[in-house]
UniProtKB/Swiss-Prot annotation:
Keyword Lyase among record annotations: yes
Keyword Cytoplasm set for record: yes
InterPro entries the UniProt entry points to: UROD/MetE-like_sf, Uroporphyrinogen_deCO2ase_HemE, Uroporphyrinogen_deCOase
Name this protein carries in UniProt: Uroporphyrinogen decarboxylase
Catalytic activity: uroporphyrinogen III + 4 H(+) = coproporphyrinogen III + 4 CO2
Length: 344
């Protein structure tokens, strides 16, 4: 039964003797089987839009490690592509998009009710996964948070300081907020379709939340997360939402109450002890082992994993990394982490 799934129990506020575990980017280039399937697909976007192959790479880490959750294999930039932005990937450099910096650029975007024409293969991937995943494994869908997605749409690429997005916000706030509103509404529909296809949990990734300060954090990180969560809860009241305002620092405090999310995912810039005292008091937390341990391994990996489990043992906790696993990670270190979490 779904109610017995450990991830869902933690998200409902239950403190378990052993925390459930999954890993951001658990389907990825550190796994040889992923690289083989990626080669079969031809390129990254072709893999995302091929339901059978996307389901296969989602299932690979479940078969290998027995994680408590599978996260849909996709990308946060599929939504901007569905809204009409050009999207391509440059080998060794990452994503590129056509930029949205003028009203004319914005006017070329598609309305939200047209996104399914592009995103239907993603929903089919979800349906395949619900059929093929082990009964005890929770299926997580996801999307990027509006601020983070906007930073890519404005700059046309990832940037170290999100300066182009901050510049548009300051110079043409009306256009900036119109773009954020379009992304917010698109995110609500995109996540709702994932849920209708079978996702049991959804996660909102705000990878660049840490670059928002003060009133901007409230307005462009908290408020969109609250709006999306409220809309999801109105349509799907039983579906938990995880929020990840990466590098929010003190902004993690009160995030769950301000947004309505069921769980706050933590990066590893905050200590587990601090987060237990300041964030876990409001409910479930997820995290927050440094992904570098998946590369270096050794006793430090075991010790830090056990320390995080201990720090969060007084409340609901889902074990995860503080950032996505990197391509240079050792697959054996992932198993060592899992064994340490599960007390083996």
């Amino acid at each position: 039964m779904a109610a017995a799934k450990t991830i869902l129990r933690s998200l409902a506020g239950e403190t378990l003797p052993t925390p459930p575990i999954w890993m951001m980017r658990q389907a990825g280039r550190y796994l040889p089987e992923y690289k083989a399937t990626r080669a079969q697909a031809g390129d990254f976007l072709s893999l995302c839009y091929n339901p059978e192959l996307a389901a296969e790479v989602t299932l690979q880490p479940i078969r290998r490690y027995g994680f408590d959750a599978a996260i849909l294999f996709a990308d946060i930039l599929l939504l901007p592509q569905a809204l009409g932005a050009d999207l391509w990937f440059v080998t060794g450099e990452g994503p590129r998009l056509s930029t949205i910096t003028t009203q004319a650029d914005f006017d070329k975007l598609k309305p939200v009710d047209e996104i399914d024409a592009v995103l239907n293969p993603i929903y089919e991937t979800v349906r395949i996964l619900r059929r093929e995943l082990p009964q005890e494994t929770t299926l997580i869908g996801f999307a990027g948070a509006p601020w983070t997605v906007a930073t890519y749409m404005i700059a046309g690429r990832g940037t170290p300081d999100q300066a182009p997005a901050h510049a548009l916000k300051d110079e043409n706030r009306e256009l900036f907020e119109a773009l954020l509103a379009r992304i917010t509404q698109g995110t609500i529909e995109y996540l709702s379709r994932q849920i209708e296809a079978g996702a049991e949990v959804v996660k909102i990734f705000d990878s660049w939340a840490g670059s928002l300060k003060g009133a901007d954090f409230q307005r462009y990180a908290l408020e969109p997360a609250r709006e999306i969560t409220a809309a999801i809860k109105a349509r799907h009241p039983d579906i938990p939402v995880i929020g990840f305002p990466r590098e929010a620092g003190d902004g993690y405090i009160g995030f769950a109450k301000a947004t309505g999310v069921d769980c706050v995912a933590l990066d590893n810039s905050v200590s587990a002890e601090w987060a237990a005292a300041n964030v876990q008091v409001d409910g479930c937390v997820q995290g927050n082992l440094a992904s570098s341990h998946m590369v270096t391994g050794g006793q430090a990996l075991i010790d830090e994993t056990r320390a995080i489990v201990k720090a969060f043992s007084g409340g609901p906790h889902i074990f995860n990394l503080g950032h996505g696993i990197t391509p240079d990670a050792d697959p054996d270190n992932v198993q060592r982490m899992i064994d340490a979490v599960r007390g083996q």
